């Protein structure tokens, strides 16, 4: 998607499909006002800055591709790189970036690569959602050094409406003990 496309989305809004986690995928219109408010929350909750480098591997018609980090980063003037997801390439390229959003299936695919064993995700912000994020995924990414935010509801509500940030194994265990 060219930058002109982002400007049109910011000015006019856009419609995207929900992931279908709560039933059939729904086409939901995102008004310019909703996008602006959602971008502000995404910027704040994920600590996006003008110096952020976003690696987008979700499709642009998916909230994870457009709303999680890409549109907020565009608003800031941050660097954005968009490409089709390939788990081997993601492992090879992620350390060039500060932020990436994965859906759980992508996270699982990344974890199955040979490069995962030696991957260091220190100082990388991973947002993951669109479907249930299993504890073992959160734990695996945090053990690699990532700050990991699990989120849901970004199409219907906002990009970071329901989220929890994990930056240590202790925090994972503390949170799990409260809900289990």
For every predicted segment, state its role.
Residues 99-102, 111-173:
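Gly/Ser/Thr-rich phosphate-binding loop
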Residues 2-17, 47-53:
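Conserved pre-ATP/AMP-binding loop-to-beta segment of ANL
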Residues 21, 77, 153:
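Conserved G/P- and acidic residue-centered "switch" motifs that form tight phosphate/ATP-binding loops
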Residues 12-28:
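Conserved adenylation A10 loop of the ANL superfamily
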Residues 26-45, 49, 53-112, 125, ...:
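AMP-binding/adenylate-forming
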Residues 174-180:
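Short Gly/Pro-enriched turn/cap motifs at secondary-structure boundaries
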Residues 23, 62, 156-159:
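Active-site proximal helix/loop that lines the substrate pocket
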């Amino acid at each position: 998607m060219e930058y002109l496309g982002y400007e049109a989305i910011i000015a006019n809004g856009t419609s995207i499909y929900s992931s279908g986690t709560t039933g059939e995928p729904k086409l939901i219109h995102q008004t310019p006002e909703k996008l602006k408010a959602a971008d502000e929350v995404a910027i704040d909750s994920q600590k996006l800055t003008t110096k952020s480098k976003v690696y987008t591997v979700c499709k642009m018609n998916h909230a994870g591709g457009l709303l999680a980090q890409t549109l907020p980063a565009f608003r800031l003037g941050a660097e954005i790189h968009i490409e089709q997801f390939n788990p081997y390439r993601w492992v090879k390229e992620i350390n060039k970036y500060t932020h990436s959003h994965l859906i759980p299936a992508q996270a699982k695919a990344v974890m199955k690569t040979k490069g995962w064993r030696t991957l260091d995700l220190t100082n990388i912000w991973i947002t993951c959602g669109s479907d249930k994020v299993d504890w073992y995924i959160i734990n695996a990414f945090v053990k690699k050094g990532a700050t990991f935010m699990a989120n849901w509801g970004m199409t219907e509500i906002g990009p970071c409406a329901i989220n929890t940030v994990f930056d240590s194994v202790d925090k994972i265990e503390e949170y799990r003990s409260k809900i289990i």
